[in-house]
């Protein structure tokens, strides 16, 4: 039986909140089978839980947040959620003593290292996948995103940024998903923003944690970060990272092919909700033995250099 995964032990780190610019303590806790992914704000009394759920997602200008029925929110969940998807963590409690997950370096890599440091524990319950049975597509103007049947999880993402720093040949990225592929090819890709937007937000008391340490920053002509890019196509790789995190908001890995053109958090979430709302478009899948499991989802065997 392919089993659900959680952590072996509690791990903790600190970082800076993108919105507040203040120090945030992040604690990752193991959870029992069928708990799912739970985000928890411990700065509130009593603490407030936010189960990962496609319907709770709100897309703001700066990040993805989860909002409960009382309009309480937890922000900047997308990069950690992508790391959970990357390692196939089914059950976890994510605690922060703030309204937001720390931004770290703007990628998912610090979270991958933290999760690997905790270690992965298999639980004695079958891991449940969402298997796509029919194509589902959503559109917004010229932007679109689609999930279609595929025995694995493949991603094909195209961006269309007219900017001197983003070469036309680096605007499409394709990948057959695996924990190793995610860790090596996607997790290190950072979020990006315009200097003018960051300055405008900070003048209004927003994005106070935004800096060269946690994003690729561009002006109208070039990348301003001293060390440049981590990949020549880091921009599109980060959009794929975002999509992996967005699609994991249902708390289950997807078996299917994801294709997108100029999609973002809002459209990715719209696609996930459209799939889940169309009962004939998907089914639950479990696997009795590894031989029948798509190679994509074999247990991660990561040695991170």
From Swiss-Prot:
Gene3D superfamilies: lpxc deacetylase, domain 1, lpxc deacetylase, domain 2
PANTHER family in the cross-refs: UDP-3-O-ACYL-N-ACETYLGLUCOSAMINE DEACETYLASE 1, MITOCHONDRIAL-RELATED
GO cellular component, one term: membrane
Pfam families attached to this UniProt entry: LpxC
Alphabetical list of HAMAP family matching this protein: LpxC
Cofactor(s), by name: Zn(2+)
Originating species: Erwinia tasmaniensis (strain DSM 17950 / CFBP 7177 / CIP 109463 / NCPPB 4357 / Et1/99)
Protein name: UDP-3-O-acyl-N-acetylglucosamine deacetylase
The protein's role, per its UniProt record: Catalyzes the hydrolysis of UDP-3-O-myristoyl-N-acetylglucosamine to form UDP-3-O-myristoylglucosamine and acetate, the committed step in lipid A biosynthesis.
One Gene Ontology molecular-function label: UDP-3-O-acyl-N-acetylglucosamine deacetylase activity
Keywords: Hydrolase, Lipid A biosynthesis, Lipid biosynthesis, Lipid metabolism, Metal-binding, Zinc
GO BP field: lipid A biosynthetic process
InterPro entries recorded: Ribosomal_Su5_D2-typ_SF, UDP-acyl_GlcNac_deAcase, UDP-acyl_GlcNac_deAcase_C, UDP-acyl_N-AcGlcN_deAcase_N
Active site, per annotation: 265
Catalytic reactions of this protein: a UDP-3-O-[(3R)-3-hydroxyacyl]-N-acetyl-alpha-D-glucosamine + H2O = a UDP-3-O-[(3R)-3-hydroxyacyl]-alpha-D-glucosamine + acetate
Enzyme Commission (EC) number: 3.5.1.108
Pathway: Glycolipid biosynthesis; lipid IV(A) biosynthesis; lipid IV(A) from (3R)-3-hydroxytetradecanoyl-[acyl-carrier-protein] and UDP-N-acetyl-alpha-D-glucosamine: step 2/6
UniProt: Zn(2+) binding residues: 79, 238, 242
Family: Belongs to the LpxC family.
């Amino acid at each position: 039986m392919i089993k659900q995964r959680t952590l072996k032990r509690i791990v903790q780190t600190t970082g800076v909140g993108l919105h507040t610019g203040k120090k945030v303590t992040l604690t990752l806790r193991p959870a029992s089978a069928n708990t799912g992914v739970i985000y928890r704000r411990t700065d509130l009394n009593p603490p407030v839980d936010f189960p990962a759920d496609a319907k709770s997602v709100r897309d703001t200008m700066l990040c993805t947040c989860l909002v409960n029925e009382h309009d309480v929110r937890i922000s900047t969940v997308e990069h950690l959620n992508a790391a959970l998807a990357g390692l196939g963590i089914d059950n976890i409690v994510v605690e922060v003593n703030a309204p937001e997950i720390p931004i770290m370096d703007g990628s998912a890599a610090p979270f991958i290292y933290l999760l690997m440091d905790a270690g992965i524990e298999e639980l004695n319950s079958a891991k449940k996948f969402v298997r796509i049975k029919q194509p589902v597509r959503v559109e917004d103007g010229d932007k679109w995103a689609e999930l279609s049947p595929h025995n694995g999880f493949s991603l094909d993402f195209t961006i269309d940024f007219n900017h001197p720093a983003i070469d036309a040949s680096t605007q499409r990225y394709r990948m057959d998903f695996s924990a190793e592929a995610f860790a090596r090819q996607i997790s290190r890709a950072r979020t990006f923003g315009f200097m003018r937007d960051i300055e405008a937000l900070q003048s209004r008391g927003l994005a106070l944690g935004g800096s060269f340490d946690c994003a690729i920053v561009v002006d109208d002509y070039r990348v301003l970060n001293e060390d440049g890019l981590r990949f020549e196509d880091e921009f599109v790789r980060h959009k794929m990272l975002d999509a992996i995190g967005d699609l994991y908001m249902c708390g289950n890995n997807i078996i299917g092919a994801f294709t997108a053109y100029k999609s973002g958090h809002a459209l990715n979430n719209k696609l996930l909700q459209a799939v889940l709302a169309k009962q004939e478009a998907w089914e639950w899948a479990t696997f009795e033995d590894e031989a029948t499991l798509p190679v994509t989802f074999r247990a991660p065997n990561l040695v991170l250099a």
